[in-house]
From Swiss-Prot:
Assembly description: Homodimer.
GO annotation, cellular component aspect: cytosol
Annotated protein name in UniProt: Tryptophan--tRNA ligase
Motif 'KMSKS' region: positions: 202-206
Residue ranges annotated as motif 'HIGH' region: 12-20
Cellular compartment(s): Cytoplasm
E.C. number(s) listed in UniProt: 6.1.1.2
PROSITE patterns in the cross-refs: AA_TRNA_LIGASE_I
Similarity field: Belongs to the class-I aminoacyl-tRNA synthetase family.
Lineage: Bacteria, Bacillati, Bacillota, Bacilli, Lactobacillales
Length: 340
């Protein structure tokens, strides 16, 4: 019996950070190690071009960095197919066929797209590729017959749009060749969207308020020591607030079961006074380094042999293309356009 299929990926627009790690990467490794699924993980460079068309060098430079991030967190190319979206031309052809089943009005109603258009300040100059990228996502998902797609809650409209396209295609062409996917959403929404070190609602590459998976130990230390805490906690003996204090927020997310007694005691001590921010930050640093040290070690090993990293991407893309080609053939048969 074949395993259920999972598809997931990232836009290669820069290095990945702790927000990506707790939001998706760590869970991908757990799913991989369960050995219950066939997994495809991809670098969505074509999607990144929808709002970086004039900055393609950023995407090119990011491919290797994101691949290193994948491998360093523990994704295993022997267990997971890692590929580059643009190396699978079948995805673009599938997108074209699906576009004929989706109205412009439906795309414009997609709440995720509407929010992102406003955030990016496109105004009336919306790139066509950006507006239709939910259809491209549907092609990505259906090409690999994904049963499950791990995404954040903000991506629920994208999953629903893919499900609509699958139902429309299968009904129109009287087939069942496309698989209707299900989203896998974060159980802990707080962990799924890690705030920035400065207390900003989201850790972001553009805001420069994150800890990158590629940061060395000294850089991580400096960033942790500059974290936002309680601005009114001026003296050690002063009572402090843990609400909105990023150090305690991070401890809640990164602390393991065996850390909970110490963290609870620290919270009580901090709130009653007598515990300084330097001590809490050093404790958090130890917790973070417990996660980051093995990641950093694996990254250094892969950095010594970038030819191996590129070979992993090349072989993964070849494997992925075989699967996508089979799906495309089935789609064309259903449509009656397999002429020869």
């Amino acid at each position: 019996m074949s395993k259920p299929i999972i598809l997931t990926g990232d836009r290669p627009t820069g290095k990945l950070h702790l927000g990506h790690y707790v939001g998706s990467l760590k869970n991908r490794v757990l799913l991989q190690n369960e050995n219950k699924y066939e997994m495809f993980v991809f670098l969505a460079d074509q999607q990144a071009l929808t709002d970086h068309a004039k900055e393609s060098e950023i995407i090119k430079d990011s491919i290797a960095n994101v691949a290193l991030d994948y491998l360093s967190v523990g994704l295993d190319p022997e267990k997971v197919t890692i590929f580059i979206q643009s190396q699978i031309p079948e995805l673009a052809e599938l997108t074209m066929y699906y576009m004929n089943l989706v109205s412009l009005a439906r795309l414009e109603r997609n709440p995720t797209v509407k929010t992102e258009i406003a955030q990016k300040g496109f105004g009336e100059s919306i790139p066509t590729g950006f507006l239709v990228y939910p259809i491209s996502q549907a092609a990505d998902i259906t090409a690999f017959k994904a049963n499950y797609v791990p995404v954040g809650n903000d991506q629920k409209p994208m999953i629903e749009q893919t499900r609509e396209i699958v139902r429309s295609f299968n009904h129109t062409y009287k087939t069942n060749c496309l698989v209707e996917p299900e989203g896998i959403y974060p159980k802990n929404e707080a962990a799924g969207r890690l705030p920035g070190l400065d207390g900003n609602a989201k850790m972001s590459k553009s805001l420069g308020n994150g800890i990158f998976l590629s940061d060395d130990a000294d850089t991580v230390r400096k960033k942790v020591m500059s974290m936002y805490t309680d601005p009114n906690h001026i003296r050690v003996e002063d009572p402090g607030q843990i609400e909105g204090n990023m150090v305690f927020h991070y401890l809640d997310i990164f602390g393991r079961k065996e850390d909970q007694t110490d963290i609870a005691a620290m919270k009580e001590h901090y709130q009653s006074g007598g515990l300084g921010d330097v001590k809490t930050k050093h404790y958090l640093l130890d917790i973070l380094e417990r996660e980051l040290t093995p990641i950093r070690r694996r990254r250094l090993e892969y950095e010594k042999n970038m030819d191996q990293v590129l070979d992993i991407l090349k072989k993964g893309s070849e494997t992925a293309r075989e699967t996508a080609s089979e799906t495309l053939s089935g789609v064309k048969r259903a449509m009656g356009i397999n002429y020869f």
